[in-house]
Amino acid sequence: MQGIGSFSTFDEFLRLTYGDKHWQSSTRVVYSSSPNDYKYRNRDKKENIYDEDKNIIGSYYPTERNRSGAYKDMHVLQEIYYNTGEGDRFGLNAWYINSNRELAMLSTDYGNDMDFENRQREQTFRGVLSWDHVREKWKVGVKGGYIHTWMAYDYKR
């Protein structure tokens, strides 16, 4: 499935599933991206209008383009379950995130946006192993998880 939104925003989604008497599997992939470079009236920045004698004769709020708002995000989710048919169910859930997001400049920044980088990058893995033992009147289960996140903040002027 694909979604298209304003400011050249694109979202892609894919899901694959499989299941039989013992095995169930689901794989999902999501990718979102956007330059996110919309125009807006910057009410934090007032520009003066001068006459030839340098007297202020008016002012206005400039229309600017959002700078450093782009993003690219990818998520992959994998779920696998095995049912023994005798009351035991084993599971594996894994989720991976790869994110690259620009962080917006200050709305009063007069610098050249080509000389500026303000970005957050992230890679995260989350995994869970599980075991459930089910009987007619009771259930017991054990889950164990692991999370690893790498994150970086890049700033260059």
Listing of model-derived features with the role each one plays in the protein:
Residues 4-5, 19, 134:
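Structured loop/turn residues at secondary-structure junctions
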Residues 4, 15, 143:
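Small/polar loops that bind or transfer phosphate-bearing groups
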Residues 38, 67-73, 87-136, 140, ...:
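Flexible loop and strand-edge segments within Gram-negative outer membrane beta-barrel domains
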Residues 8-33, 45-100, 123-125, 129:
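Transmembrane beta-barrel wall of Gram-negative outer-membrane proteins
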Residues 1-4, 25, 29, 140:
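Transmembrane beta-strand segments of Gram-negative outer membrane beta-barrel proteins
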Residues 41-42:
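Soluble oligomerization/assembly scaffold segments of membrane-associated complexes
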